[in-house]
Amino acid sequence: MPLTLRELTADELPASWALGRMAFGGPAEAPARALRVVPGMTRLGAFDERGTLVGKVVDVAHEQWWGGRRVVAADVSGVAVRPETRGGGVARQLLTELLVRARERGAAVSALYPTVSAVYRSLGWEVAGSLGATELDTAALPRTRAVDGLTVRPGEPDELPLVTELYERVARQRQGLLTRRGGHFDEAPDTPLPEGVDALSLVFDGDLLVGALVFGRGTGYGVESKLDVHHLLATTPDAARALVGVLAGWTTVTRAVRVPLLAGDVFSTVLPLERASAGSATAWMHRPVDVVRAVADRGWPAHVTGRVSFRLRDDVAPWNAGDWELEVADGAATLRRAATEPDLWLDVRGFAVLYCAATGGRALGQTGLAGGSGDPAALDLLACGPRAELLDYF
């Protein structure tokens, strides 16, 4: 089917919402945020010969933290295709166009949450992690009080920028987390608190915010009642213990609390995780938009030095394909065209998994995403550093 691919106009956003609602469900009336033009966000549409919108995709234009540096991302959301045209390659054309446009605007990497992973695998994305949360019985939480020098108090809506600054102190040395700056993050909310948030509890050390609990109360106070924590942040063990004590104070009216955690973060050393009653995990996928930028723009472990050459396969983004040499030194890295033919090869999906430190070279070789006559353990250089994580759904 011949398609016209272009950016949607403001007048076409209601039709875009209707298409998304058909795919994912939702209210008949679009929320105001869905009908606004957001700076930096690119909404692409596919139109048939009659001018009917038959598919759409959104480039959310985030930035991700990688080793203390901001990396421009083309994170993907809202992929939807009309049922009459599904299976006809509409999504493939839209996502290929998104990658071309994203590279032109300077994007280096891309993440998404798949509904059907096979579609995205065929286009070079691969599962590299999961967005998770842990559910705990509030009665199992230690009732810890704040130590001298810390102040625990309710937060106000106008203090949310302080929470963002605290998040940045936590997130910037990790891999893959959104910066939560720019685009829709800078938009004024329609309500004093974000959707689903009822209150904040803050911990101060003097004038410095060192801990924040942002949560939704939920409904009821019986056995099914649950506190839904949106953000749980701290930069010191004492601040973490103080916030866990606040959560424990909900024992009489909420039987469970659902908390997002980062691997090895300060709350992981304070909470009784062995008492977790349930959890959830939503897979996310990653891919390079431009491999040269993806390597050069991020921070790398300062103690790692090395080189490895490989042939990269990328049929969808041909500018990434070819023979490359990766060199890492002094907390930085470069990717240059290899002078000689490499003895290792790497599929772009394998590049994504290694880049996110989700596996090593030899294990990747068992998946068929890497190979060659050389030892695939040499590809561990691309995977050096902490594993990538996400805390935001989009």
Task: Please provide the spans of the model-predicted regions.
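Aromatic-anchored glycine-rich loop motif in surface-exposed flexible loops
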Residues: G129-S130, L136-T144
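Conserved active-site alpha-helix within GNAT-family acetyltransferase domains
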Residues: R103-A108, P114-G132, G264-S280
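Intrinsically disordered, low-complexity, positively biased terminal segments
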Residues: P2, T9, G149-F394
